[in-house]
Amino acid sequence: MAAHQNLILKIFCLCCRDCQEPYAINDSKVPSQTQEHKPSTQNLLLQKDELDRQNPKRINAVSHLPSRTPLIQTKKSTSSSSSEFEDLNAYASQRNFYKRNLNRYCQEHWPFQPCLTGRP
């Protein structure tokens, strides 16, 4: 049961933005089960090569994709300013659809809660 609790604490700390060290939880009492079952990268590459040899259709389907590039390009906007919300309000009002006070969702009004999991 302690292994499940440690796993839950690690997941919550990984999800929390304010945690600096997600693996700072002391799990020396419980042996790590994830390391025992974790396949090495060499084994994964061997399995992939075997699959490619067995299924030539898979090679053709994957070959047109560039290597190590994400399929979906994501925009990396770290913060949204209030002028962006004003632009949205103006655009929405032009279409006779008005969203009220979008500024209430900005980071200053609703900051992230600090992670208190596993801390004294």
From Swiss-Prot:
Residues 74-83 have a biased composition (Low complexity). Residues 29-45 have a biased composition (Polar residues). It comes from the Eukaryota. Residues 29-86 are annotated as: Disordered. This is Testis-expressed protein 48. The lineage of its organism: Eukaryota, Metazoa, Chordata, Craniata, Vertebrata.
